Amino acid sequence: VACSGDADFIPIEAQPEPGLSMPPAVEGPFPVTRVVDGDTVRVLIEGQDTSVRLIGIDTPETVAPNRPVECAGPEASVYAEQLMSGEDVYLELDASQGTYDNYNRILAYVWLEEDLMVNLAMIDAGLAEEYTYDDPYTYQQLFQEAEQDAKDDLRGLWGQIC
């Protein structure tokens, strides 16, 4: 879906989710080397530039070969850059999703702080849809509720941006 975009679009400021905190089993911190798009980031792990796909979300395409840039894709990418560029992140794996996807990207929840998860922040801003690949995942219900809230409030994809 192509769209004209909204140059004045500013997503909501990322807010911690009450009662949600980074679990003790996270890995990191890892420096972000590049934000690829709204749901993929590259981080430095043991000297290797490694691609990470955020679990449970799907953002509009901006870099897929042979596909047009989708509505709100640039905005999702910019917001992800605002959240993660120059930051150190922590990765939480989810056994239900496996370690890698079909493109050899690590599958993870990406945490910026003790109580701020990027995956959820993207949905809260209305710049990502909840996405279940095959099996249910740890934060599925929370992500689905956040998506419904974004829809109800007409944020991002569900507002005037598209």
Task: State the predicted function of each range.
Residues C3-C162:
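Small beta-barrel nucleic-acid-binding modules, primarily SNase/OB-fold domains
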